[in-house]
Structure formats: C-alpha cells, structure tokens
Curated annotation (Swiss-Prot):
Protein's name in the database: Orotate phosphoribosyltransferase
Lineage, opening ranks: Bacteria, Pseudomonadati, Pseudomonadota, Alphaproteobacteria, Hyphomicrobiales
UniProt cross-references to HAMAP family, sorted A to Z: PyrE (MF_01208)
PANTHER family, A to Z: OROTATE PHOSPHORIBOSYLTRANSFERASE, URIDINE 5'-MONOPHOSPHATE SYNTHASE
Function: Catalyzes the transfer of a ribosyl phosphate group from 5-phosphoribose 1-diphosphate to orotate, leading to the formation of orotidine monophosphate (OMP).
UniProt-listed Enzyme Commission number(s): 2.4.2.10
Any one GO biological process: 'de novo' UMP biosynthetic process
Binding-site residues, 5-phospho-alpha-D-ribose 1-diphosphate: 98-99, 102, 104, 128-136
Similarity comment text for this entry: Belongs to the purine/pyrimidine phosphoribosyltransferase family. PyrE subfamily.
Subunit structure: Homodimer.
Keywords: Glycosyltransferase, Magnesium, Pyrimidine biosynthesis, Transferase
Length: 187
C-alpha cells in the first residue's frame, strides 16, 4: 500500500473508531464539542500497524535512539513503532514515562530500559496520541531531559490545533503531527 493510501486508510479508521462529537472535558481542563480517543485505533491490528508504519516513515531520517512518551497514550504507539523499526532494520527502542513514579519495586519514573541502561546522551522523540496544549507531552519532555537525553522532537498522531505548536516552540522543540483535528472536522 502506498504512503498516501495508508494515510487515507488510517484516517478512516481513526474517524470511525476514535473520533466523536459531543461535549467532553479534555486533559487540559478545556471543554470541547469533539474528541479523539485513539486507544481503539492503536489497539486495533490494522490501526496499530498503519500508525507504526506511518510514524516510522515520519521519523526514519531523524537518527533516533529511543521513542517514548507519557503513559498511557504513548505506550501502544511506542511499542508498535519499536517492533516495526526492528522489522525495517533500523531499531528504535521504546520506553514510557509514568505520570508519577511507582511507590514500590524499583520506583522508576521511566520504564522499559534494561537494568543499568539510561537515556543519557541518547536522541529521543516524545510521542503522543492526541495533543491539545502540549502540557502532557511537556511533562514527558521534562522527565526525559532530566536523564541527560536530547529530546529532538515531539510527534503526535492528532494535533487538536489548540496551542501545542506554541508550547513546543517556546521550549525549542520541533513539533510534527500525522493529522490535524481540522481534517476530521471537515470530513
């Protein structure tokens, strides 16, 4: 399937499984009359594959060591991308950032790294399923930067176009999206 055909097919899957209209309160606290819940798309076999392939294509030239983001939205995507990247011969390892460190066990804030391995000096992309203001992704950025990693960009599946570009710009971070909310609102 061509890249444009994959993008069109994924758009339809997101529209059917993950986009809705109706009043909701977003993670940012804002009210909205439409919403995206990408988990049904990210956990669907075809949706997960298309998301991972399109994300890999968007990132393959960025010379990345790791992909990760804040739980829960980044976990399915990071895992699927790690798998696709290995299949394509350019492995990008995955991790996720806990909203708060576990209070038991190893008490980790960042999960998925082998024992003794760190993100220090590594090139990292932060991914997110849906981005509104960028606040949630910035929490992940801050946690990852504290490890000494270089966060090279933030990539979201859907940009709600409500301030994230400004948030990441102020932090000196490039920001990319696979889709814009306006594409779904016009469909």
């Amino acid at each position: 399937m061509s890249k444009s055909a994959s993008r069109a097919r994924l758009f339809e899957i997101i529209r059917r499984r993950s986009f809705g209209r109706g009043e909701v309160t977003l993670a940012s606290g804002r009210k909205s009359d439409f919403y995206f819940n990408l988990k049904p798309t990210m956990l669907d076999p075809e949706g997960a594959t298309l998301l991972a392939e399109l994300t890999y294509e968007a990132l393959k030239d960025d010379n990345l060591d790791f992909i990760g983001g804040l739980e829960m939205g980044a976990v399915p995507l990071a895992g699927a991308l790690a798998q696709i990247s290995w299949i394509k011969g350019h492995p990008i390892a995955a991790f996720f950032v806990r909203k708060k460190p576990k209070e038991h066990g190893a008490k980790l804030a960042i999960e998925g790294l082998p024992r003794g391995e760190t993100l220090q000096g590594k090139r990292v992309v932060i991914v997110e399923d849906v981005t509104t203001t960028g606040g949630s992704a910035m929490k992940a950025v801050e946690s990852v930067r504290e490890t000494g990693a270089e966060v090279v960009l933030v990539l979201t599946m859907v940009d709600r176009e409500e301030g994230a570009t400004d948030t990441f710009g102020a932090a000196g971070l490039p920001f990319r999206s696979l889709y814009k909310a306006s594409e779904f609102l016009k469909a």
